[in-house]
A protein has these predicted regions:
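Short hydrophobic alpha-helical runs that function as membrane-insertion/retention elements
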Residues: 199, 291, 312-315
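N-terminal, Lys/Arg-enriched amphipathic/low-complexity engagement segments
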Residues: 26, 33-89
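Short coil/turn segments at secondary-structure boundaries
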Residues: 72-73, 141-145, 159, 452-459
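Short acidic, Pro/Gly- and aromatic-enriched capping/linker segments at domain boundaries
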Residues: 97-103, 413-416
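Short, positively charged
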Residues: 77-85, 165, 392-400
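An N-terminal, globular interaction/scaffold subdomain
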Residues: 59-64, 99-102, 106
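Buried, small/hydrophobic-residue-enriched core segments of structured protein domains
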Residues: 1-33, 41-43, 79, 85-94, ...
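Gly/Ser/Thr/Ala-enriched C-terminal appendages of enzymes
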Residues: 1-31, 40, 44-46, 281-283, ...
Length: 481
């Protein structure tokens, strides 16, 4: 079981430790900082991403502890003094952490996780936080694209063997399920996360027997209630489908059973599925489904459907489990504010030649604005102490092209920044994975179809409150001098 409370404390970049040692030496042990995780672009040029990975991050945070083995290793590097090693030995989390809940559509620039606490603690969480959310957000986003392309047809996650390591296969299956997949081929993920397991046979099963018919016959005898036959080992139309029909007639029919389906894993799937459908129907098996696999992605799935392919479900492997077409999520973790001794916050931001790469300072919240029909219209980032009131409507403006304004009436605002930890104590109860999946589907349905386009989606606006925009503008002017 990989999803247990394992100690991942040293799953960090070395410079997190060297910086932390410097903070301690400078007297910054209790200096309160605010960091945000956000991302700058949606993978595959999409209109939105899917939040995923919070449960695994929580499990890792709950298990933070520097063991004596860790301390001894760090001592052996020669980079750290005993004062810092003693600090690590007695390490305890005191941070406040907010996050957008799993399954929620998320957008560039908005903080999807915010950490407030002693600077050393914030720094030591960075790598662990990024590796967790960057992976699962990436895979959940890709899975959601593929599931939407299937237009209601079931999508099965088949990617374990092509994943980049055990954790990637295991947690990738979880993220794929959040994104909308109906099952996984990964037995460990199915067992631990309660995801339905799926899978029947490989070509090696067919090749192991004297004939394809013999292989099909044995499988049908063993699994009469779940008989799905792989029909492309030799020739789909000359041998595979005819042999499958023969086994259905000779083995399943006498038992009073019906076949579940056939799977096509190669060739021109649009053409083969049409021919196979005709053969199955004529043989009296209109209820026998056809599953397609073979390096599919959202574009191929969409094209198959547009071409009239008679495919009832899809098995997706490497293109989903690795997000092969755009395999880096690109989430970053940046300092947003530092709390002074008097309790006030000094905003911090990173400058850039590109406006899109300049960070947003201050301790903040993210709000989603919905119209009277429940459709998401825009997101609004505010200072943490602001409350968004919508009784009399709300006017939002583009933070870069400020002359672009839009006023929404009869709308509601939902705060997305959910408390996860308060002073190091967990205050959030995680929903079940099935509930996260349902939540994801419901929230994606609040987006306009134009935002969900695969090519050239409408840009969903993420705006700043007037107070936050003014603060950022003043800081930008000050830092640019």
């Amino acid at each position: 079981m990989l999803d247990v409370k394992r100690n991942l404390t040293t799953m960090t970049d070395f410079y997190e430790l060297t910086m932390s040692a410097g903070y301690l030496d400078e007297g910054y042990k209790d200096k309160i900082a605010v960091f945000d995780m956000f991302f700058r672009k949606v993978p595959d040029g999409g209109g939105y991403a899917i939040m995923a990975g919070l449960e695994q991050f929580i499990n890792a945070v709950d298990s933070l502890e520097f063991t004596e083995e860790d301390i001894n290793y760090l001592r052996s590097t020669g980079a750290f003094n005993e004062q810092f090693l003693d600090y690590l030995r007695n390490f305890k989390l005191h941070c406040n952490i907010w996050a957008i809940e799993e399954g929620m559509p998320i957008f560039p620039q908005e903080p999807i996780v915010t950490v407030e606490g002693p600077a050393i603690e914030c720094q030591l969480l960075e790598t662990l936080l990024l590796v967790t959310f960057n992976h699962q957000c990436l895979i959940a986003t890709k899975a959601n694209r593929i599931v939407r392309s299937a237009a209601g047809r079931p999508v099965m996650e088949f990617g374990a063997r092509r994943a980049q390591g055990y954790d990637a296969a295991y947690f990738g299956a979880r993220a794929s399920y959040i994104g909308g997949c109906g099952s996984t081929s990964c037995v460990m993920a199915a067992r631990d996360f309660g995801i339905p397991a799926s899978g029947t046979m490989a070509h090696s099963w067919v090749q192991m027997f004297p004939t394809e018919y013999d292989a099909f016959k044995k499988y049908a005898e063993m699994y009469p209630d779940a008989c799905v036959l792989l029909v492309d080992t030799y020739n789909v139309l000359r041998h595979g489908v005819p042999d499958a029909i023969k086994v259905f007639d000779e083995v399943l029919k006498p038992m009073g059973k019906r076949p579940k389906g056939i799977r096509i894993d190669s060739g021109d799937i649009a053409y083969l599925s049409k021919k196979a459908r005709k053969m199955l129907d004529e043989a009296g098996y209109p209820d026998c489904t056809i599953c397609a696999s073979n390096s599919l992605d959202e574009y191929i799935v969409r094209d198959l459907i547009l071409q009239g392919a008679r495919v009832d479900s899809f098995g997706i492997g490497e293109n989903m489990i690795t997000a092969k077409s755009d395999p880096v999520f690109g989430g970053v973790y940046k300092l947003a504010a530092v709390r002074e001794d008097d309790g006030s916050y000094t905003p911090k931001m990173k400058l850039s030649e590109s406006a899109e790469k300049m960070t947003i300072p201050c301790l903040k919240k993210v709000w989603r604005i919905y119209d009277q029909d429940g459709k998401a219209m825009a997101d609004l980032i505010t200072m943490a102490d602001e409350v968004v009131e919508t009784q009399h409507g709300i006017t939002l403006f583009d933070p870069i092209e400020t002359w672009k304004e839009c006023t929404y009436v009869n709308c509601t605002a939902r705060c997305l920044s959910t408390p996860i930890y308060e002073n190091g104590k967990r205050v959030y109860s995680s929903p079940s994975l099935d509930d996260i999946k349902k939540f994801c589907k419901a929230q994606v349905n609040t987006l306009w179809d134009e935002v969900k386009r695969f090519e050239n989606p409408h840009r969903y606006y993420v705006d700043l409150s007037q107070k936050l925009w003014d603060t950022r503008s003043a800081l930008l002017k000050k830092l640019s001098k």
